Structures are given as structure tokens and as C-alpha cells.
Amino acid sequence: MRQTFFLPSHVEGCCAALRRAGYAAYPVGGGVRDLLLGRAPQDWDVTTSARPEEILALFPGSVLTGGVHGTVTVPTPGGPVEVTPFRAEGGYSDGRHPDAVSFGVSLEEDLARRDFTVNALALAPNGTVIDPFGGLADLDAGVLRCVGNPARRFGEDRLRMFRALRLAAQLGFALYPTVEAALADAPSPANLAVERVGAEVDKALLSPRPGWVGEMLRYRLLVPWLGSTQADTTPLAALPARPLERWAGLAGLLDDGELPEKLR
């Protein structure tokens, strides 16, 4: 794991502007995780003590894109940065979205609502990694572990079950035993939008380990759309990592020519 961290200038600039205005600001989430793994982050998120209206006032041209979550997309020369206030969430009656969101909480409270320990990491201004839930050790061990109780986390947002398997495919990580147990007793994901499910399947299919899509079948996560189909998906790794080939390969293994349409 890398020990020296160089933030892209547009991310550092976004954080610096928030700090000059008197707010705390930390790069957080998947961008930090990928930076620590030596991977090129695809997206950057910043969490801050500023509220949505304060973020919008500070960055001309920024747009509120996260609705009740308060996420503001800040355009920069290096690409957009998603800036979100520290927040806590409560109640998930639909198994996907929080019933209530509150701002003005601490950084640790914000990190505590996140899905996996490796995504609950933040970078302090001096480059120190803020890691209240053991995410660094899990990165070193190559395991995906939930923040808190995995059954509760999956019950809050059932798309997290798909994210667990997709991240395992992308990162080459193993699932922590408690995560495996929660998946084996998972709630039905039938309430999820098929487009969101299909996007997670697509990312797993195009990863270096597309056979993990078979785990989605084994854990019966795709039953609402595909029924109880099972298949050995290891041959997918031999196909070029292009959407047409991988989707066609999966459709062939499942003997379902309509598969792509069912998950889009």
C-alpha cells in the first residue's frame, strides 16, 4: 500500500477553498481507498462541515445534485468533485433510501453511516489517514467488511449487497465472514430499480474477475429478474473485457438471449 499520497490539484484546491472559508473538509470514500491501493481514482468525494447552501455560495457554477443528501457537484478544471456535508441518516423504510437526513454532525458520525470499512476512510490536511473503523487493516488484508452489522447495513440499502460483490470483483478482495453470512440470509432486493442492479452487474462483468457475477446468482440476488438460474461463470474471464463480449458470454452461460434487456 502506498505511504505517500498526492492529491490531484483540483481536489486539493476544493478542500483548500472550504478550509479558507472556515469549514472542515476531507477527501473521503472510494477515491481515498483507491489512492491508498495505488489505483487511479475515477471519482472524488469531499465531506465537509459546510452546509449545502454554503457550498453552493462558495463555488460559482456548482449545482445541488444530491437532493436531500445535500451533495453539491463542484466543477473544476480537473473534473467534477462531489462535495457533501457531514451527515447522519435515520430510518430506511424502503430498504434503499434514508427516511431522515441530518447535517451538522461530526466526521466520525459521517463515516459511521458508510457501507464498508475501506470506504470509511478520510484524508486529513496533513496527509494522515483518518480510520475509525479499521479500514486500513482491511485494505492490507484484502477483505471487504461492513461498518457495523452487515445485516443492518444491507437492510438499510439493499444495493449494498451488489456493491459488495462488485467491489470484490474489481479489487480482488475476499468477503469478510460476517458479510458472507449476511448475504446468505439477505433480504429480497426486488425493490431496487433494475437500472441500478444492471449497472452493478455491468461493472462486475467488466472487472478483472467477472466470475463474481456467479456469486450474485449463488446468493440469489438476481432472482427477481432472472429467476433461480445458476451457472459456472468462470469462463467469462477468458473473454475480452468489453461489454458486448462479456454480456453475450453471460447470456450464453445462462442460456438466456434476453438477459441484457432484463437487467437494463
Predicted feature locations:
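Catalytic cores of the polymerase beta-like nucleotidyltransferase superfamily
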Residues: 1-264
